[in-house]
C-alpha cells in the first residue's frame, strides 16, 4: 500500500509536521527524502530496504551511486535526492567554520572534522590553520594513503603554515577501520610535528583522530603539552 493510501496524519511527512523530525524513525526520515516509493514499494519500505542493505542510515548516505542503484526501486534521481541532503548538511557545517570564524567551540570543530573525514575509505591527514586569535584561515588535506611516521612530512606542514601565515594549527586524520584510538605511530607523528612547529613559534593545539562514531583528542588526553 502506498503512503498516499495511509490514514490521514500517519505518513512520515505528516508526522514530521505534527510531531517534529526527532519523533521519526531513521526509515521515516529517509522516506521523506525519497518522497515516494517505486517497484511496488512505498517510500518507507524502500527506506527500510536501504537501511537493511547497508547497515544503517549513515552507511546509506555514504554509499556510492552504483551501490545504491543496485537496489530495486532506486535510481539516479533518488540517489541525487539523498546526496543533496548530505551536501546541504556538509555545507552548513563548513559555513560554521568559514574563514574568519573564531574557533571557540570544541564541539563545532569535532562535528566539522567528523563530517569531513569519517566516511573516507582511505586515510587522510589534514590541518586546520588558525590565526593568532584562533580564527579559521583554511582547512587543508595534506596527505592521503597509509598515514604513519614515514608518510607525514613535518617540512611540508611547516611550509604550508608559513605560506598561510598561521599562528596555530589543529591536525587531524581518520582511521578507516572506524576505531579512533590513536596508535603509537600517531603519537610519534604528533611529537615530530610539535617540535617542527615550535621552531617557527606556531602552536599545535590538538591532534584529533576521527573514527566511526567518535573523535579522540590528544589535547584532552594531555598528550600535547
UniProtKB/Swiss-Prot annotation:
Renumbered to this chain, motif JAMM motif spans: 173-186
MPN domain residues: 102-224
InterPro entries documented for this protein = MPN, RadC_JAB, RuvA_2-like, UPF0758, UPF0758_CS, UPF0758_N
Pfam (any one): RadC
Q: State the UniProt keywords alphabetically.
A: Hydrolase, Metal-binding, Metalloprotease, Protease, Zinc
Q: Where are the transmembrane segments?
A: none
Q: Which GO terms describe its biological process?
A: proteolysis
Alphabetical list of CDD domains matching this protein: MPN_DUF2466
**Record: residues binding Zn(2+):** 173, 175, 186
A single Gene Ontology MF term assigned here is: metal ion binding
Q: Which Gene3D superfamilies match?
A: 5' to 3' exonuclease, C-terminal subdomain (1.10.150.20), Cytidine Deaminase, domain 2 (3.40.140.10)
Question: In terms of domain of life, where is this protein from?
Answer: Bacteria
Q: Which family does it belong to?
A: Belongs to the UPF0758 family.
NCBIfam families, per the entry: PRK00024.1, radc
In Swiss-Prot or TrEMBL terms, this protein is called UPF0758 protein Swoo_4561
Lineage, highest ranks first:
Bacteria, Pseudomonadati, Pseudomonadota, Gammaproteobacteria, Alteromonadales
Amino acid at each position: 500500500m502506498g503512503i498516499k493510501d495511509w490514514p490521514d496524519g500517519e505518513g512520515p511527512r505528516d508526522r514530521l509536521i505534527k510531531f517534529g523530525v526527532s519523533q521519526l524513525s531513521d526509515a521515516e526520515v529517509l522516506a521523506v527524502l525519497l518522497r515516494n516509493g517505486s517497484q511496488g514499494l512505498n517510500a518507507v519500505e524502500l527506506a527500510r530496504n536501504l537501511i537493511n542493505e547497508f547497515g544503517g542510515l549513515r552507511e546509506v548516505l555514504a554509499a556510492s551511486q552504483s551501490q545504491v542503484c543496485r537496489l530495486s526501486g532506486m535510481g539516479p534521481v533518488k540517489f541525487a535526492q539523498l546526496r543533496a541532503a548530505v551536501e546541504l548538511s556538509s555545507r552548513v557545517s563548513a559555513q560554521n567554520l568559514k574563514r574568519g570564524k573564531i574557533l571557540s567551540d570544541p564541539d563545532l570543530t569535532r562535528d566539522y572534522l567528523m563530517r569531513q573525514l569519517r566516511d573516507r575509505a582511505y586515510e587522510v591527514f589534514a590541518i586546520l590553520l588558525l590565526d593568532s586569535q584562533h580564527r579559521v584561515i583554511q582547512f587543508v588535506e595534506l596527505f592521503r594513503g597509509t598515514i604513519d611516521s614515514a608518510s607525514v612530512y613535518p617540512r611540508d606542514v611547516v611550509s604550508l603554515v608559513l605560506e598561510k601565515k598561521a599562528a596555530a594549527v589543529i591536525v587531524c586524520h581518520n582511521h578507516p577501520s572506524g576505531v579512533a584510538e590513536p596508535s603509537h605511530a600517531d603519537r610519534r607523528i604528533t611529537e615530530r610535528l610539535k617540535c617542527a612547529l615550535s621552531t617557527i613559534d606556531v602552536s599545535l593545539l590538538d591532534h584529533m583522530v576521527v573514527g566511526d562514531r567518535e573523535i579522540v583528542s590528544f589535547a584532552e588526553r594531555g598528550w600535547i603539552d
